[in-house]
């Protein structure tokens, strides 16, 4: 096919993206490294207007929900940077946000960042954050919540005190506690004070059932979906060369023609190219286990490495796996899966004919990543995720993948299984101790 003679570099420009591990350390970098989309610009304008109009009104707190890695923490840190440093507001080039920022008082707003996961309770983390902002010893702040937020309100004076609650990026483990009731209590108390409260809802507190249903009553919840990331990637990480759109269409058409299970739309494929769309689907799950995995930084770094490849060679799951493997191996919930992975890699993959080894190794990597959501994947879905296809025989790749996974299952049925879904099609996956879908 003529189009596939083109290289990735002929179609796309790969731009650098500076990855930040802590958005609160350098406000200038935090702001300059943030790319607004129409969605986040509207959200930021809305949040800024709430701060402007806060005084004298009993208004609910704000919460930002969304998949891990979608940009909630960066959004909150940008808000904090603009509130804390009035000189930075003039650097905002997004018109909607710039206009909203101009309505703020041209002075410093006190800000406190509560970092969930660093102490045993949210109350302790709140006290630590307020102690830093109020410049008081934490031991002096063992007070009722009403008094704590009263001190914060007094600190603000004529402007609201900005209280931001987010999960700490440097936490050692996933936060597994129920903070819903106390978050609701903080919101109810802040509503009577000159305190603006904004929080990030991670999966451990985002449920709308049980005790955490209190959050939906106490907060105005905005949702930041992955569509935002598609737009950032397309505009700021992988801008396409306009004269090569026909070539890119040809690449997509080629994949769809030879991979019937390639289910992603052309719009989505084009936005993310040269990154496989499946990566955005596994990114939140990877981020759950590897806290410092940053999709945009990964995309920029991986993109720079594949510029010389053929146009149909996408950044794939194997590159994600290679980047995060060492960190995933440290996760207790994945210990058994990696023990099985190592055994299969050594005793099964290593003994296959040379021509089959590379594909089998790639299947093993993909299967482990794709199993982490607990649902399992069909042979067709694995083919589409890894771009396995045979131009002369479209059924051959499906059979090869199914045969390869069957070899894994026969070797270690206690670790990998194939389970029929409602349609009768087999879904394959590693058995993970904390996932019930496939298990």
Q: Where in the sequence are the language-model features?
A:
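Conserved P-loop NTPase "ATPase switch" module shared by AAA+ and STAND
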Residues: 151-179
């Amino acid at each position: 096919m003529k189009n596939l003679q083109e290289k990735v570099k002929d179609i796309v420009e790969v731009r650098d993206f500076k990855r930040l591990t802590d958005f609160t350390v350098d406000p200038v970098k935090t702001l300059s490294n943030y790319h607004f989309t129409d969605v986040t610009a509207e959200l930021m304008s809305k949040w800024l207007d709430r701060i402007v109009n806060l005084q004298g009104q009993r208004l609910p707190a704000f919460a930002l929900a969304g998949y891990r890695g979608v940009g909630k923490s960066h959004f909150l840190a940008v808000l904090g940077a603009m509130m804390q440093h009035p000189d930075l507001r003039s650097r905002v080039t997004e018109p909607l946000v710039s206009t909203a920022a101009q309505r703020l008082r041209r002075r410093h707003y006190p800000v406190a960042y509560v970092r969930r996961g660093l102490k045993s309770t949210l109350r302790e983390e709140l006290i630590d954050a307020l102690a830093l902002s109020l410049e008081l010893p934490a031991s002096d702040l063992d007070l009722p919540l009403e008094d704590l937020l009263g001190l914060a309100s007094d600190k603000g004076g004529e402007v609201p005190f900005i209280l931001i609650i987010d999960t700490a990026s440097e936490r050692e483990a996933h936060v597994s506690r129920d903070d819903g009731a106390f978050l609701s209590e903080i919101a109810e108390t802040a509503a009577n004070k000159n305190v603006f409260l904004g929080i990030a809802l991670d999966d451990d507190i985002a449920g709308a059932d049980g005790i955490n249903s209190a959050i939906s009553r106490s907060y105005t919840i905005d949702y930041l979906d992955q569509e935002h990331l598609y737009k950032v990637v397309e505009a700021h990480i992988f801008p396409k060369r306009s004269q090569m759109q026909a070539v890119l269409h040809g690449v997509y058409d080629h994949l769809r023609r030879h991979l019937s299970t390639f289910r992603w739309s052309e719009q989505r494929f084009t936005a993310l190219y040269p990154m496989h769309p499946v990566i955005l689907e596994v990114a939140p799950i990877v981020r759950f286990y590897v806290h410092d995995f940053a999709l945009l930084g990964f995309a920029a770094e991986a993109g720079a490495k594949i510029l010389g490849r053929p146009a149909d060679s996408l950044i794939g799951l194997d590159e994600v796996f290679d980047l995060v493997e060492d960190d995933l191996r440290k996760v207790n919930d994945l210990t058994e899966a990696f023990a099985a992975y190592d055994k299969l890699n050594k005793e099964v993959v290593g003994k296959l004919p040379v021509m089959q080894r590379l594909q089998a190794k790639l299947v093993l990597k993909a299967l482990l990543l794709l199993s982490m959501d607990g649902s399992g994947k069909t042979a067709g879905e694995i083919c589409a995720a890894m771009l396995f296809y045979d131009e002369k025989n479209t059924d051959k790749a499906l059979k090869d993948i199914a045969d390869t996974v069957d070899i894994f299952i026969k070797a270690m049925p206690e670790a990998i299984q194939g389970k029929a879904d409602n349609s009768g099609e087999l879904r394959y996956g590693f058995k993970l101790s904390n996932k019930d879908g496939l298990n």
